[in-house]
Swiss-Prot record:
Keywords recorded for this protein, A-Z: 4Fe-4S, Amino-acid biosynthesis, Branched-chain amino acid biosynthesis, Iron, Iron-sulfur, Leucine biosynthesis, Lyase, Metal-binding
NCBIfam families attached to this UniProt entry: leuC, PRK05478.1, PRK12466.1
Protein origin, superkingdom: Bacteria
GO BP annotation list: L-leucine biosynthetic process
Record gene name: leuC
A Pfam family matched in the record: Aconitase
PROSITE patterns recorded: ACONITASE_1, ACONITASE_2
Organism in which the protein naturally occurs: Bordetella parapertussis (strain 12822 / ATCC BAA-587 / NCTC 13253)
Protein name: 3-isopropylmalate dehydratase large subunit
CDD domains membership: IPMI (cd01583)
Subunit record text: Heterodimer of LeuC and LeuD.
Enzyme class of the recorded protein, top EC level: lyase
Signal peptide residues on this chain, from the entry's feature table: none
Length: 467
């Protein structure tokens, strides 16, 4: 029987299935960070248990770490306690951790693939919703809660039911000036933030195959914003080449055996999905969110929508609240919206290709006078090192951007990098909820190139015609 990629990954990890469909699923890789792990480790200790398989765990502090003056340590006592607790727990149980001053430290969803700790065919979990990122590598990856973190530590398994399957097929050549970020924002604009609820999404089609592995990670990262718990892309030669020489990747005969298996990780011809969405890449333009949900998104050449034209009462009310929070008026051209801050980073867009794309726009220009701060935060120490080898840091610094240390940074208001009330930010992150980047902060989601262009222009511009 023809199987989807999701079927193959799921079936390969089912240890036991109950009559009601509840399955005991084996977990290959468990990624840990400082925010959702302390209570899990405490529960483990109180029960007198040890991690079932120490080597399956990899830890890194990312949410609370400072991206400036790191040598001075963490100023906030709660943030410092969370990071110190992760250090102590990993030392206690012998879990591999990339500590704050380790070159390999970075955002958990950047360092996992970067190290080859995430591999095709794996089940990958982390106490973080954007674990879906790792599905871009042909893995089944999803976020879990703190109690589940403890369960995985103790048993290397999870109890769960299989989701429905959805295929989002994107066909055609991606237009000039458009990126993976624009692809996924466009998709969310079509299906909404609940469109993928209850489903595992496989992204497929010539457009997805044309993306780099890092671009695919951007798309899968935001599968959760489409309502799905996981997103994935079939393995191809790009995937396999990506893992050659990675520290955790197999070598020698084991590499050959792994590659043989990885090449089976695709949906079979004739495999049936519960839902199929077809997207024409020719319809995609550079995207900008205007509201307080990723589904509130439009092409950059659009205008802020008018709630009075919305017939659905619930949607109209949501639009009105979003416009009030964002301080925007209906029918305002998106290119007329000025920005106060620019953030290039996050687990969505902080990899080397993202920084290169932003640097192309920033080269030889200056951050606009009305922009109070523009920062670039690499996704890991290794990404930062590579960018500096290529001279990208100099391009950004000469243009007036701040060049920071790796971490989650301004993606969320959990560290020193945050917006002040009323400040408007062009951000390459994944969520634009009220207060996400700081109480009263206003977030617009864009691609790295669009963010860099907004920094230079002082307002949103169409990167396709930006000079």
């Amino acid at each position: 029987m023809a199987q989807t990629l999701y079927d193959k990954l799921w079936d390969a990890h089912v240890v036991h299935q109950e009559s009601d469909g509840t399955c005991l699923l084996y977990i290959d890789r468990h990624l840990l960070h400082e925010v959702t792990s302390p209570q899990a480790f405490e529960g483990l200790a109180l029960a007198g248990r040890q991690p079932w398989r120490v080597g399956a765990n990899l830890a890194v502090a990312d949410h609370n770490v400072p991206t400036l003056n790191r040598a001075q340590g963490i100023e906030d006592p709660i943030s410092r306690l969370q990071v110190d607790t992760l250090d102590d727990n990993c030392a206690k149980y012998g879990i591999t951790e990339f500590r704050m001053n380790d070159l390999r430290q970075g955002i958990v969803h950047v360092i996992g693939p970067e190290q080859g700790a995430t591999l095709p065919g794996m089940t990958v979990v982390c106490g973080d919703s954007h674990t879906s990122t790792h599905g871009a590598l042909g893995a089944l990856a999803f976020g879990i809660g703190t109690s589940e973190v403890e369960h995985v530590l103790a048993t290397q398994t999870l109890l769960m039911k299989k989701a429905k399957s959805m295929q989002i097929n994107v066909e055609g050549e991606l237009p000039f000036g458009c990126t993976a970020k624009d692809v996924v924002l466009h998709i969310i604009g079509i299906i909404g933030t609940a469109g993928g609820t209850g489903h595992a999404i496989e992204f497929s089609g010539s457009t997805i195959r044309g993306l780099s592995v890092e671009g695919r990670m951007t798309v899968c990262n935001m599968a959760i914003e489409a309502g799905a718990r996981s997103g994935m892309v079939a393995v191809d030669d790009k995937t396999i080449d990506y893992f050659r020489g990675r520290p955790f990747a197999p070598v020698g005969v084991l590499w050959d055996q792994a590659v043989g298996y990885w090449r089976t990780l695709h949906s079979d011809a004739g495999a049936r999905f519960d839902r199929v969405i077809n997207v024409d890449a020719r319809d995609i333009k550079p995207q900008v969110t205007w509201g307080t949900s990723p589904e509130m998104v439009l092409p950059v050449d659009g205008r802020v929508p008018d709630p009075d034209r919305e017939k659905d009462d619930v949607r109209r009310s949501g639009m009105e609240r979003a416009l009030e929070y964002m301080g925007l008026k209906p029918n305002t051209p998106l290119v007329d919206i000025r920005v106060d801050r620019v953030f290039i980073g996050s687990c969505t867009n902080s990899r080397i290709e993202d920084l290169r794309a932003a640097a192309v726009v920033a080269r030889g220009k200056r951050v606009a006078a009305n922009v109070r701060q523009a920062m670039v935060v690499p996704g890991s120490g290794l990404v930062k090192q590579q960018a500096e080898r290529e001279g990208l840091d100099k391009i950004f610094i000469e243009a007036g951007f701040e060049w920071r240390e790796p971490g989650c940074s301004m993606c969320l208001a959990m560290n020193a990098d945050r917006l002040e009330p009323g400040e408007r930010c062009a951000s390459t992150s994944n969520r634009n909820f009220e207060g996400r980047q700081g109480q009263g902060g206003r977030t617009h989601l864009v691609s790295p190139a669009m963010a860099a262009a907004a920094a230079v222009a002082g307002h949103f511009v169409d990167v396709r015609s930006f000079r």
